[in-house]
Amino acid sequence: MKHITKKLLLSAIALLPAWAVGQVPANSTDVMLQGFYWNSQKLTGWAQLEQMAGDIAKDFTLVWLPPSASAEGGGPVGGNNVGYHPRQWNNQNSNWGTADQLKSLITTLHNDGVRVIADVVINHRAGDTDWGNFTADDFGSYGSYRLTAANICSTDEMNTDPSAGKWNGMATGAPDTGENWGGARDLDHTSSLVQADCEAYLNWLKGEYGYDGWRYDFCKGFGGKYVGIYNDASSPYLSVGEMWDGSYDVVAEWIEATGRKSMAFDFPSKYAAFNNGLAKGNYGSMSWQEDNSTWRPAGMIHHHNYRGLAVTFVDNHDTYRDDNKYTGDVPQAYAFLLASPGVPCVFYPHWTQYRRFISPQIDARRRTGITSESDVVVTQHSGYYESISTGTKGKLLCRIGAAAPKDVPTGYRLGCSGDGWAYYVSEETPSGISQTLYDKNEDSTLYDLSGREVKKDAKGFVISSDGRKMLK
């Protein structure tokens, strides 16, 4: 894969330390759960997630929640309004649950050691009862604001769509700084009022509800520099933007536009490594050369300037419901994801269906000390994928593919494995089983690091299916 503008872009920042600016955790050991999917309100609403908080905390340090503001269309708790057309920012009653249930969920997750990421939709906003009559934003001590048609981009369809009726031509804000979003009003982020409103909103979410960080929706819709401004004002633990583009250069340019003050979802990795790579048995697509030298896992994570600024994922609520969905072997995909740098984000349906594989993979990542900035080298093979990740506690060798060797490499021991994938951890890696014995979803059977069934004998020893005693 060629990156035409990458060299020019990197030369401009070559003298900067990787973490010179921004609210981005360095050498992060975080693993994130996307705690919802499209129309999962009855399964992953606030009340349901709170009941799962203990299990979530066994695997994850971050949970990304869906949009929690009252949205266009309204509806009851458990209804099918996902929330991506927010109507009233200071009303946190949604189809996902009530404001009180949201506060309770976040408190419970915090008590279990899990930080919470809000899905922030500020590119666009729905009118209260019509095209452009926004509700007032009363954030109490954080400030009160009211946006009008003067705060809507002049390029919004409200000025061109005849069905806007009396609102047609009334949007008098500056031209959009990004792509237009049809169906809701594009906010003019050059406006000082819009900026003040957004900053108050974020600080209110943080102060009143306990959110720790932000996932910015539809970042193609407004300039990246505004994300930097909003992060400076709200100081999130972690910020990640949905810059939905498979181009390395496009995502890198957006990160730079924020002032390197936000991470970005690694869509280049999603498409190269998963959709066009592993799903098609094209192992060569799963790695890129860093500066025409060392082979690394494909995506933003292939380069040292961006791997610590990437949130990697296999699927999300959007890609999972159309032809962007990953169609290959899911445990194999997470073997790649959890052996790679960046902050990995696990999709809720994948976690619940394949937890007996994903949990041991997460545990192996933690036991070897793999971080968002870890050095990972890919060795080239025509019929399988192989990488070695160097963590703070040991090394993790990952093999994916039916043709991959099954022997245990010298200096390593088997960490965990499944159909067509295996993790080997270096001998110096701390041993023992941690967060790896759990209830399988469909029954109460226990499994070990390698997915083998285990049980206890009369003396309390855990016995694997091959008869070996493992622990007491």
Task: Show which residues each predicted segment covers.
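Bacterial Sec-dependent N-terminal signal peptides
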Residues: 1-23
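C-terminal tail/sorting-segment detector
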Residues: 1-5, 461-472
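Boundary/entry segment of secreted carbohydrate-active catalytic domains
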Residues: 23-45, 180-186, 191
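Active-site-proximal helices and loops of the catalytic beta/alpha 8
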Residues: 24-34, 38, 51-57, 66-69, ...
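Aromatic- and acidic-residue-enriched carbohydrate-binding clefts of CAZyme catalytic domains
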Residues: 28-30, 71-107, 136-188
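Substrate-binding cleft of carbohydrate-active enzyme catalytic domains
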Residues: 97-130, 134-138
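Residue-level detector of functionally pivotal "anchor" positions at catalytic/ligand-binding pockets or at interdomain
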Residues: 428-450
